[in-house]
Amino acid sequence: MKTAHGRIQPVFYWAVGALLVVILAAVLLPTQLEQITATVQQFISSTFGWYYLIAVTLFALVCLFIIISPYGKIKLGKDDDKPEYGYLTWFAMLFSAGMGIGLVFFGAAEPMSHFAINSPTVEEGTIEAARESMRFVFFHYGIHAWGIYAIIAVCLAYFNFRKGKPGLISGTLSPLMNTDGLKGKFIDGFGLVATVTGIVTSLGFGAVQMNGGISFLFDLPINFWIQTIIIVIVTVLFLTSAMTGLNKGIRILSNFNMILALILLMFIATFGSTMFSLNLFTNTLGTYLQTLPELSFRIAPGSPDAREWINDWTIFYWAWWIAWSPYVGTFIARVSRGRTLREFTIAVLIVPSIVGFIWFSFVGGTAMSLELNEVINLSALTNEEMMFGMLSTMPISTITSIVTIVLIAVFFITSADSATFVLGMHSTNGSNNPPNGIKFVWGMVLSVTAIALLYSGGLQAVQNVMIIAAFPFSIILLMMVFSLIKSLRSERSQFSTNQPQLVIRKQSREDEDDSSTTDKD
């Protein structure tokens, strides 16, 4: 099958076939599939939790090594390539694709959960619980999470723009194996299915969460039909954006989102628990950095309750970020041509982590402060309602709540828009500008599937499948890291070989200048 700009690859049909099997099972046998996948997920967490901790920490360490090493000077592209986007637009795009919607949804809910309901180490509802809660939020949304995104993105961008390989996962493994045949197609198909399951579950759960927020504000019911209307509206908007391309749709919406998020953050910082949040940010940043090695390898042997918490939160999050990484990494790589490895890794690893820390400190800090001072019982609300409950204690709460819903919706749109772009790339042999036709097809597949799963109650089962798929994909990620290191070492040796020649040429020019000066004298 051909489109206006390229050929749809067989991996598209294989991925759709595999996806249909999963979706049909989730629609027809949601309870059975959820039970089976939950058991498998629990087995992986209990048996291979140690592996996840080591692997994800390794990804973060490799990113830090790239920042401080001489390899950081290497361009993602030809040596004279210039960045396609300015810093602010580039950062807005990668942040919107990576974690933007999660910060809005869980900015208040996650710190409140650790603080009031399920504290990992101390008594719930205390100031100590507030400090511990924020420390673990920093850990789960900090450099480990962004390290996963950064490592896959840097591999994809390096091999695509500098080595001329297709913008596919298989293209990053060429130094280790021949990926032109079935092996490469299988790897790309696996990444495609992981991307689709991740986006579908996010569309479904996102619709439920938006329904919860609208219900809190306008006293509307929470039901399938309202969620379907939300998905239909979002689909029309993200497909319209997708048809306009990166330089219009996603770029404009991402910039708009960052401005709106900054306005909302400044409002909360002004009318929320300002000093408590500032002190909490400062204190947590110190304890996070101080205890980062311990947190990175904390597995709690011989302590069943602590180990259960680690499985349910830390291991789950590492698997979740890994499962999302094919989509987020591909998109970040696509918009990063012309950057050096160093500036790319700093921008993807450090900057979003700090922004997330600030957001959680003010939003989550204000929520916990309100609960500590008995202003409002936020822990009695659902996750979908906590952000709006917190805003209800501040001036112009109706307006700020509507702004929050708009912010969630636009993050929703940019995520789905980016996803259709990435799926289009993977379906057309890594094309950096996939045709609108294939993006439209994927957009419809995502939306119809999300609606079907909402109707059947199979969303949780598909999310479990996504988390399970993270385990084998983490092995592919490790292979990508070794492949990148091997290729960088080869390139570094070429630089070392060329260096004496540069010195000789420079010395020759100096000798010529000296000779010329002598002649004139």
Predicted region positions:
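Transmembrane-helix boundary/entry motifs in multi-pass membrane transporters
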Residues: 2-10, 45-49, 79-97, 133-143, ...
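Helix-loop-helix module between adjacent transmembrane segments
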Residues: 4-6, 10-13, 18-27, 60-65, ...
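Membrane-embedded translocation segments of transport machinery
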Residues: 182-186, 190-339, 346, 351-402, ...
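Long, low-complexity, intrinsically disordered cytosolic termini of multi-pass membrane proteins
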Residues: 499-521
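N-terminal alpha-helical transmembrane segments of multi-pass membrane transport
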Residues: 1-129, 243, 266, 482-492, ...
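Membrane-water interface regions at transmembrane-helix termini and the short interhelical loops
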Residues: 1-5, 29-44, 63-82, 133-140, ...
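Flexible loop linkers connecting adjacent transmembrane helices
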Residues: 2, 35-41, 69-87, 112-135, ...
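Hydrophobic alpha-helical segments of multi-pass membrane transport proteins
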Residues: 18, 51-68, 261-272, 355-365, ...
